[in-house]
């Protein structure tokens, strides 16, 4: 058999810590999806701006428009 399950009833549960108790409310929404589009439009705008940024960097790297008078090796 490739996988094997071990049943051990003597295994303790998760350990309680102060930090864990402080962070537990932050994890209570895990797995829930807000209805509607949510922040999708903002992500689209961010992706478009990032694409513009990459194209500007590519133009500078290729010395196509902005660096016509400067010689590069």
UniProtKB/Swiss-Prot annotation:
Q: Name one GO cellular component term.
A: chloroplast thylakoid membrane
Q: How is it modified after translation?
A: Phosphorylation is a light-dependent reaction catalyzed by a membrane-bound kinase; phosphorylation occurs on Thr residue(s) in the N-terminus of the protein.
Name where it's found: Plastid, Chloroplast thylakoid membrane
- Any one Gene Ontology molecular-function term assigned to this protein's record: phosphate ion binding
For this UniProt record, give its keywords in alphabetical order, as a comma-separated list: Chloroplast, Membrane, Phosphoprotein, Photosynthesis, Photosystem II, Plastid, Thylakoid, Transmembrane, Transmembrane helix
For this protein, the record's InterPro entries field holds: PSII_PsbH, PSII_PsbH_sf
Query: Could you name the domain of life of the organism this protein comes from?
Result: Eukaryota
What cystine linkages occur within this chain? none
Gene Ontology biological process terms, A to Z = photosynthesis; protein stabilization
Phosphothreonine modification sites? 3, 5
Q: Which NCBIfam families match?
A: PRK02624.1 (NF002728)
Q: What does this protein do?
A: One of the components of the core complex of photosystem II (PSII), required for its stability and/or assembly. PSII is a light-driven water:plastoquinone oxidoreductase that uses light energy to abstract electrons from H(2)O, generating O(2) and a proton gradient subsequently used for ATP formation. It consists of a core antenna complex that captures photons, and an electron transfer chain that converts photonic excitation into a charge separation.
Looking up PANTHER family in the UniProt record yields: PHOTOSYSTEM II REACTION CENTER PROTEIN H (PTHR34469:SF4)
Family, similarity comment: Belongs to the PsbH family.
Protein's name in the database: Photosystem II reaction center protein H
Which organism is this entry from?
Oryza sativa subsp. indica
